[in-house]
Regions:
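General small-molecule cofactor/ligand-binding pocket signal
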Residues: 68, 102-105, 149-151, 281-283
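Dinucleotide-binding Rossmann-like beta1-alpha1 core, especially the glycine-rich loop
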Residues: 25-106
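Mid-domain beta-loop-alpha active-site segment that forms a flexible
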Residues: 110, 123-140, 263-267, 315, ...
Length: 324
């Protein structure tokens, strides 16, 4: 029997609060993986990420998860240097990894995205976006139907390792043959050697009021997800009820940035000045865990204690793959 110990509620953390972008690949560039593990293993890892995207779509279909999946993701360049790097990346992924990204110049991008801020885009038709909390809850429902036991509000306070590891909570314990640690930024002392490998980073997102279908689709005509390539990036997409969801800003503090709603609204207006009469109706945030090089970190602590963390903002598809 599989038992899940959840410190809060299903989807309380990054799995429910994230921006909803499901992207093939990882938080680092492929050349980082090549330096870490070699070209052959880097190719294998990239193919794993493609498999993770296929797995995500199959799970949505198999379990009839109503999470508003939409195809298409664009990584956009603001500065000429970024434009050159993105275009070279499109060529490299096609030639060396057999991955068919599309390069859009400024005019081609402008046909789909009503913003003059960007110089070009790498468009990935295989990636896309979804409602993250609906997806997380759908996976939980499928797990329950398969016989998994889920205990919410059950934070683990101690992991006792051994032939049969034990996880203690404030109200009881679970003894298991195998343990998977998937707490990301919230391990809270149960595996210090893992916590030292990642850093929690706050990221924030807001939603406008419903704009109406015509106005919303005038912003992103093909309904793709979009992200720029800055370190503290902007990312955005449309929701099923025709809101613009606009995220970005990074915080390395335990507190959200002051004046967050105003800051996020100004960032949105910088991309879409035609929304100068629109503010963000809701703003929320949460913490992702990133590694120093943004490469994912998963493996085993002991022969029967596994871990998966450090997805660095690219966990929607690749976490499912890591679990598999």
């Amino acid at each position: 029997r599989v038992t899940v110990l959840e410190a809060e509620r299903i989807g309380w953390g990054a799995s429910g609060r994230n921006g909803g972008q499901a992207i093939v690949g990882y938080g680092c560039e492929q050349d980082v993986l090549e330096r870490l593990v070699g070209e052959g293993e880097a190719r294998l890892l990239f193919d794993f990420s493609r498999d993770g995207m296929t797995m995500l779509k199959r799970r949505i279909e198999r379990h009839a998860i109503a999470c508003d999946w939409r195809d298409g993701y664009a990584s956009v360049a603001i500065r000429p240097r970024q434009e050159r790097a993105l275009r070279a990346w499109v060529d490299e992924m096609g030639q060396r990894y057999d991955y068919p990204l599309q390069w859009w110049n400024r005019d081609q991008l402008r046909q789909q995205l009503a913003s003059d801020r960007y110089l070009g885009a790498a468009f990935d038709p295989a990636s896309g976006h979804l409602h993250p909390l609906a997806y997380a809850n759908g996976l939980a429902a499928a797990a329950l139907a398969a016989g998994v036991v889920i205990h919410e509000h059950s934070p683990v306070v101690e992991l006792r390792r051994g032939a049969r590891p034990q996880l203690r909570t404030a109200h009881g314990s679970v003894t298991a043959d195998f343990v998977v640690l998937a707490g990301n930024a919230w391990l809270r002392g149960i595996a210090p050697e893992l916590e030292s490998r990642v850093m929690p980073v706050g990221t924030y997102i807001g939603a406008t009021m419903p704009l109406g279908e015509e106005r919303a689709r005038s912003l992103i005509r093909n309904d793709m997800a979009v992200s720029d390539v800055n370190w503290a990036l902007d990312y955005f997409r449309l929701s099923r009820d025709h809101r613009l969801l606009f995220g970005g800003r990074a915080s390395y503090s335990a507190l959200p940035p002051p004046g967050l709603r105003g800051v996020m609204t100004r960032r949105m207006h910088r991309v879409f000045p035609q929304l100068c009469d629109v503010a963000l109706e809701y703003v929320w945030g949460g913490y992702i865990d990133i590694t120093r090089n943004r490469a994912p970190h998963w493996g085993r602590l002991t022969p029967n204690v596994y871990f998966a963390q450090g997805f660095s903002g690219h966990g929607v598809a690749s976490t499912g793959l890591a679990g598999e």
